[in-house]
């Protein structure tokens, strides 16, 4: 009896520590193969954020307390990111986008770090943070690219593209290349950090007792939060750059 119990605990522990890279649960929809585990965890993260937002705004009081107070603090924090990077005049329309990006990445990273997804068996692949899939981080980076192009064109019209030849036409290739490197740096930075953190924790859990990786997991939670902050801050900075008046 004791032996069987120890075996069960040991098997659960090794499932937590197991490292799988490149395996996915594929859903085929209209001829396209989608990474099913990414959608599952993403939906759960979005559901948790929606429930949290509804609870925080259900009964608003003039003097905030409890979860409403926390929600207002988070909103002011995210509003400050947009204001500082985009500017007092133009930041308000972009607060929802910057907030959504930050909260999704933050929730996805923490879900991957805190929840023992590996104990849930799938036919193929495993549940994990959506942000450890390069497709997700590239999609988020492309959304930011579309956003700052939209911001610049909506404010300046076709004259927005004059920025590519400023301060001199010689810089045209470099300025064009810069717009390609922005989404690349955003996506690979987030993907690399999240994937590396999960691999490090898994390897430590495999090599040493379960309590030893806890400091590494704590560091991973901190790093995950920082990555959400970096991504949202850079997104706001790129949008602010697109809205900036280069003629002054």
Swiss-Prot record:
Entry GO MF terms: proton-transporting ATP synthase activity, rotational mechanism
Keywords associated with the record: ATP synthesis, CF(0), Chloroplast, Hydrogen ion transport, Ion transport, Membrane, Plastid, Thylakoid, Transmembrane, Transmembrane helix, Transport
The keyword Thylakoid belongs to this UniProt entry's keyword annotation: yes
A Pfam family of this chain: ATP-synt_A
Chief place of localization: plastid
UniProt superkingdom: Eukaryota
SUPFAM superfamilies: F1F0 ATP synthase subunit A
Residues passing through the membrane, by range: 34-54, 95-115, 134-154, 203-223
InterPro entries named among the record's database cross-references: ATP_syn_F0_a_bact/chloroplast, ATP_synth_F0_asu, ATP_synth_F0_asu_AS, F0_ATP_A_sf
Membrane topology note: Multi-pass membrane protein
Localization of this protein: Plastid, Chloroplast thylakoid membrane
Example of a GO cellular component annotation carried by this entry: proton-transporting ATP synthase complex
Keyword Disulfide bond recorded: no
Entry's family note: Belongs to the ATPase A chain family.
Quaternary structure (record): F-type ATPases have 2 components, CF(1) - the catalytic core - and CF(0) - the membrane proton channel. CF(1) has five subunits: alpha(3), beta(3), gamma(1), delta(1), epsilon(1). CF(0) has four main subunits: a, b, b' and c.
Function: Key component of the proton channel; it plays a direct role in the translocation of protons across the membrane.
HAMAP family with a match to the protein in the record: ATP_synth_a_bact
Protein name, per record: ATP synthase subunit a, chloroplastic
Native source species: Guillardia theta
Gene coding for it: atpI
